[in-house]
Each structure stands twice: as C-alpha cells, then as structure tokens.
Amino acid sequence: SDIRAFSNAEYSDKGLEVSSDVSEAKVMIGVKEVPIDSLIADKSYFFFSHTIKKQPYNRKLLQAILKKRITLYDHETLVDSNYNRLIGFGYYAGIVGAYNGIRTIGKKYNCFKLPKAIKLRDRLEFDSALKNIMLPNLKIILTGTGRVGQGAKEVLDIMQIKKVEVKDFLTKEFEEPVYVQLDVLDLSLIHI
C-alpha cells in the first residue's frame, strides 16, 4: 500500500529484508482489503476482507479470491477457544475517529491546528498534541460503549473534557466543553 506509517527504509534499518518481488512469498499479511487487481493467485492472505457478514460491496472481491484459488484468513474470523475475536481494531478506530473529529472542529472554527494522525510518530506525540489544544464551548455526544466508543472516550478524557450525565447534558448550559456517552438504552429513552 502507498498509505503507510513506516517507510521501506525504516524496515530495512531494523534488519528486515524489503523486496518488491513477492513471487516466493507463501503468505501475504495486511490490514485492509486487497484491491482485486492486486490479488496474486495461489497465495494465502491475511486481511480484513469485509465479506464475512455478506457485505454486498465486496462480493466481487470474494469471487476473485475463489477464482484465483486464494486461501483467505480473515482477521475478523480469528477467535480463541471461547470465540472471542483475537484481532479487532475497533478501539483504535475509536481513538483515530475521535481525533479526526476534534481535528475537524479545529479546522471548522479556525481555533487550533492538529496534524493528521498518521503524521504523529507514536502515542506520546499523539497524546501531547491533544493536550495542547482548547476546544470551544461545545456539547459532544459520544454514542456507544463498545470498543469504538471506549477508544473515542479515551481521546476526550486525555483532553480533560468533562463527562456529564444525560439529564444534565439535555437541561444545563456549560461554560466549558462537555460530553455525554450514550449507550443503546439511553438512545431508546431520549430524543435528541
């Protein structure tokens, strides 16, 4: 992929062999779906194919995998003996999604600038960027308490944004940015 966090040089610097010739490789490992025209026949692939739930937009991908006699190991289907998923990026998707949302607020109101998350080298730099900004006086609704929701909550907590109860969120005015975290039951009981 051309969208990467680490360059070939960084892999080489760590002693890994980097080659554009993958003809001898038996297994290809990635994260996102591989473009259909990039699939190599008779290989084994590990990636999130987004086909396990019969997603119609990836039907052609699955058909190409079958046609090219590819063995697919979908990250989403890798589970332990209790059927708990072993690989899931939901938590990190929540972190990056919330970061991008905060970044968008800064751009919209022209009140601060955050670099793109991919430009930050590590978690320390990521957290530091968030701690150094001030949001305008906003009310933020965070929906969900699962992995994605917990990741997003972590970003708001790093920024020391005050968490408030649903009733207060709906009825009070605040002199600072605040957020409320709603779960499914909250959403079924209120009309926002």
Language model segments and positions:
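Glycine-rich Rossmann-fold phosphate-binding loop(s) that bind the pyrophosphate
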Residues: 145
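Catalytic core of tubulin tyrosine ligase-like
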Residues: 154
